[in-house]
Amino acid sequence: MGSREALLGKALWALTERTLVIAAARWEAERPAGALHTTGTGRHLNAIVSRSPGLRRLLDEEPALTLRLLTDPRGRVQTGIVTFVEALLRRDMVEFGLVPLIEPDALAYALVRLGESFLYADVLAARQPDVATANRLQQALVEGT
C-alpha cells in the first residue's frame, strides 16, 4: 500500500489538482474581457489555499512533513502547480500577447515559490500568512505593474 508519507503526498496532489481546476473555473466565470488567466486564477488559488482548514490543520500538526510534501521540487505537488501555472502563462502569451521578462517555466516556478512563501509564512518564517501581498507581487511579476 505504501508509506504514510507517500499516501499523504498522493492525497495532497489529488486535492491540489481539484483546487487548480476550481480556481481556474471561478476566475473564468468572472474574468473581464482581456484579463489574464494567470493572475486571476492565481488569486483564486491563493484564496482557496489560505482558507483550507484541512491544510491549516496539517501544517499545524505536522509542519515539516507537510511543507516537504507541498514544496519539494521533486515532489508531485509543487511540480504539478508549476506546470499548471506555466500553461496559464503560455495561454496568456498566445491569447493576449503577454511577453514575460523571463522564460515562462522560470516565471511559473518563481510565482509558485512566492506564493508558498506568503501562504505558508507562519510555518516557514514565523510570520503571518499574507495573501494580499502574495497576490500583488505575483501580479507585478506577470504584468510588470
Give residue ranges: language-model regions.
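An amphipathic alpha-helix adjacent to DNA-recognition modules
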Residues: 1-24, 43
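Amphipathic alpha-helical segments that line or abut small-molecule/effector binding pockets
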Residues: 13, 32-53, 105, 109, ...
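Short acidic/histidine-centered micro-motifs embedded in hydrophobic/aromatic stretches
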Residues: 14, 61-62, 114
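Solvent-exposed, charged amphipathic helical/linker segments at domain boundaries
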Residues: 20-31, 35, 70-71
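Amphipathic alpha-helical packing segments from all-alpha helical-bundle domains
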Residues: 21, 57, 66-97, 105-112
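Secondary-structure edge/capping motif, primarily at the C-terminal ends of alpha-helices
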Residues: 23-30, 59, 63, 118, ...
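Helical hydrophobic small-molecule/effector-binding pocket
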Residues: 36-61, 75-79, 86, 125
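C-terminal peripheral helix-coil segments that are non-catalytic and often amphipathic
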Residues: 47, 83-98, 108-145
